[in-house]
Amino acid sequence: MAVFKTLTDADMAIFSTGLVAGVDEVGRGPLVGDVVTAAVILDPNRPIAGLNDSKKLTEKRREALFDEICEKALSFHVGRASPAEIDELNILHATMLAMQRAVAGLSLTPELVLVDGNRSPAFNHAGQALTSHSIVKGDGLIASISAASIIAKVTRDREMDALDAAYPQYGFAKHKGYPTKAHFDAIAEHGVFDQYRKSFKPVKALLER
């Protein structure tokens, strides 16, 4: 498969038999909240049917798979970067930091890390440098990355639901913090609070009025 062109023979051997962590993120585009990432090491002896890119799954299916991943995975961990860190570092570097935190938090040391997308940060676990590769559209190709995308997506969606309960006037349960017309209208009427990413242009423009 073309997806494996970047993997060496040694990496392929690890992919087939070793501890492989899949990593993905959610929440780079929203105006509010953390960017959330997850790292997952699946158990090859306990396969999970139906794993796919979280965006291609219904909410009900994501929730069911979330529970199954939590039960069956050898290890998983959620990493995040806060709005303040996003504002300080920029969204790309904050996302890389969140991914590093997700991998560092695993209870097992992976032999290989596969990251969705076209770039990967340097990973360390318990003081050990790890081999990693980025896989374009990996969340639809690699089971462990699919699992990570589901863990990250469900985690962040639940956080947006909690934010919606605290600030119902913003409609977070519907738009999940993304820059929709309804969200812009709510910001124009009610302003922003500390969970907003103040470096993002729409928020910055409002604050500079």
UniProtKB/Swiss-Prot annotation:
Matching PROSITE patterns: RNASE_H_2
Cofactor(s), by name: Mn(2+); Mg(2+)
Source organism, top-level taxon: Bacteria
Name of the protein this chain belongs to: Ribonuclease HII
Job of this protein: Endonuclease that specifically degrades the RNA of RNA-DNA hybrids.
Protein family: Belongs to the RNase HII family.
Catalytic activity as recorded in UniProt: Endonucleolytic cleavage to 5'-phosphomonoester
Annotated compartments: Cytoplasm
